[in-house]
Regions:
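Conserved PLP-enzyme active-site core in the AAT-like
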Residues: 1-224, 232
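Conserved glycine-rich beta-strand-loop-beta hairpin in the small C-terminal domain of fold type I
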Residues: 216, 232-257
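Short gly/pro-enriched beta-turn/loop segments at secondary-structure junctions
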Residues: 190-192, 226, 250-254
Length: 257
């Protein structure tokens, strides 16, 4: 939904090369069949994103703490490049908002797989979109046509204009996703799953603290094990990646090793 909310056939978006495998399949194969092109940029150098921008580029996409290499993404650096071109940065923050808050660093939209750490008990399946309310969808109408051209499926509404007028908030992304994509493609959260997620949210900060502690103990053990050649964890990176870990991971270094 996040990509289809800004892209249509003939458009492109730029994604980090550090991605979960299922997301790579979605971007490389499924969206391609819909006429949406994904261009991949190596996040080791944030300027790689800018090099791929053209007049049809609608958004940037990345994961906060991508599996399996756990190289923290340069959120602010790429978000700033995007805003220079009126391009929003969409962040997959499945690593959890307890660990990192991408919107505070300039991301326009955050997506989560709620099944993982927010649910936390293996009992629900779900995802969510979080509109940061910090992106002006009308600043460059040619860059964001889906928010500035009349939507004839909804009485000619121009989402970038009408949503702030009606709500007093800059949440055009969230509203359009709900009234257009959810209307046409489905994927509403089941009530029982919603209830399970509420239970998970109550303990998320406590669970993430323990997850991170457990992971760090596992790292210490594996580093010393004679049969282990390499251990990957955010605290073990060096240089720019290590600096990003300290900058963006304020609630712990994550549960993945």
């Amino acid at each position: 939904f996040a990509i289809m909310n800004v892209c249509q056939s003939g458009d492109n978006f730029i994604s980090s090369t550090d991605l979960y495998g299922g997301t790579v399949n979605l971007f490389t194969h499924t969206l391609k069949k819909l006429g949406i092109e994904c261009r991949y940029a190596d996040p080791a150098d944030p300027s790689n994103f800018e090099k791929l921008v053209d007049e049809k580029t609608r958004c940037f996409y990345a994961e906060t703490l991508p599996n399996p290499y756990l190289r923290v993404f340069p959120i602010k650096e790429v978000a700033d490049i995007g805003r220079k071109h009126n391009i929003p940065l969409i962040m997959d923050n499945t690593a959890s908002p307890v660990i990192c808050k991408p919107i505070e660093h300039g991301a326009a939209v955050v997506v989560h797989s709620l099944t993982k750490f927010i649910g936390g008990h293996g009992t629900v399946i779900g995802g969510c979109l979080v509109d940061g309310g910090n992106f002006d969808w009308t600043a460059d109408p040619k860059r964001q046509p889906l928010f500035n051209e009349p939507d004839m499926s909804y009485g000619g509404a121009k989402w970038g204009e009408v949503v702030p007028q009606l709500t007093g908030a800059n949440v055009s992304f969230a509203v359009r996703a709900r009234v257009c994509l959810l209307r046409d493609l489905g994927a509403p959260l089941a009530p029982d799953n919603a209830w399970g997620l509420i239970q998970g949210l109550e303990t998320a900060p406590l669970r993430m603290k323990q997850h991170c502690s457990n992971a760090e103990k596992a790292v210490d053990f594996l580093k010393k094990h004679k049969n282990v050649e390499r251990v990957i964890y955010p605290t073990l990176h060096e240089g720019d990646i290590a600096a990003r870990s300290k900058k963006y991971l304020k609630g712990g270094n994550g549960a993945l090793v």
